[in-house]
A protein has these predicted regions:
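Extended amphipathic alpha-helical interaction segments
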Residues: 48-158
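Soluble, cytosolic/nucleoplasmic coiled-coil alpha-helices used as oligomeric scaffolds and tethers
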Residues: 34-37, 41, 72-75, 79-82, ...
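Post-signal peptide N-terminal segment of secreted/secretory-pathway proteins
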Residues: 1-43
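Polar/charged, Q/E/K-enriched amphipathic alpha-helical segments with strong coiled-coil propensity
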Residues: 29-56, 176-189
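Solvent-exposed, polar/charged alpha-helical surfaces in well-ordered, non-transmembrane soluble domains
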Residues: 12-22, 26-29, 53-60, 64-67, ...
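Solvent-exposed, amphipathic alpha-helical segments
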Residues: 16, 20-23, 27-34, 102, ...
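A cross-kingdom marker for long, charged
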Residues: 126-213
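Amphipathic alpha-helical interface segments
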Residues: 1-2, 6, 115-118, 201
């Protein structure tokens, strides 16, 4: 069964995602009823053990499908953004509106790349340099200076991404103190030249971009 109208690449995974989600949801609901009604007191947890195994099986089936579904959605969004960028250029030329979206597309590509456990540092550094140019062009296009917050956060993300990629490229190890900080969710972003630090700047840039709308 295909979705109508077809939305490739999501059409190929949506039905599998729905089926897996329904199966997982049904098991969770059954578990909730079982424990809410305290039925385990009547069967010495016999059904509870079976439900637990079913839950693990459903979860194992759901997770890869959910990842594929998310990836398909991201692919569609990426294509739409590129199409919108082209439309903006055709309607307005390379205005701040154009460059701000170009910055976001570039930054997202970088963030997706450097979030991986292993990546090509030279390729990442090239993308970071391209982002640096786009940020400078966005700043130049912002004649009024009204969009300083976004330009500043984009510049900060570009810098933090560059510092992290440089660390990976040059194989600079983290200190013992840094390693401890990276294990703490409250301080993880404080580590210099780290992905969490770059990610924090990325999220702030996204917030500032959304405020432009």
């Amino acid at each position: 069964m295909a979705l109508m109208p077809a939305l490739q690449p999501i059409d190929g995974v949506a039905v599998s995602y729905i089926d897996a989600a329904v199966a997982l949801g049904n098991t969770i609901n059954e578990m909730d009823k079982y424990y809410t009604q305290e039925n385990y007191k009547d069967d010495a947890f016999a059904k509870g053990k079976t439900l637990h195994q079913t839950f693990l099986k459903n979860l194992e089936a759901f997770e890869p499908v959910a990842e594929s579904y998310h990836a398909a959605i991201q692919e569609i969004n990426d294509k739409r953004q590129l199409a919108e960028l082209k439309n903006i250029e055709e309607r307005e030329g390379k205005t701040f509106h154009y460059y701000s979206l170009a910055v976001m597309i570039s930054a997202k590509q970088i963030n997706n790349l450097i979030s991986q456990n292993k990546f090509d540092a030279e390729a990442a550094m090239k993308k970071v340099s391209e982002l640096e140019t786009l940020v400078a062009q966005a700043k130049e296009a912002d004649k009024s200076g009204m969009n300083f917050s976004f330009i500043n956060s984009a510049s900060q993300y570009q810098l933090e991404a560059k510092k992290y990629v440089r660390r990976i490229r040059d194989k600079v190890l983290y200190s013992d103190w840094d390693k401890e900080q990276l294990q703490d969710a409250n301080s993880i972003w404080m580590v210099d030249d780290s992905f969490p630090r770059a990610l924090r700047e990325y999220n702030e840039m996204v917030d500032d971009y959304n405020s432009l709308r």
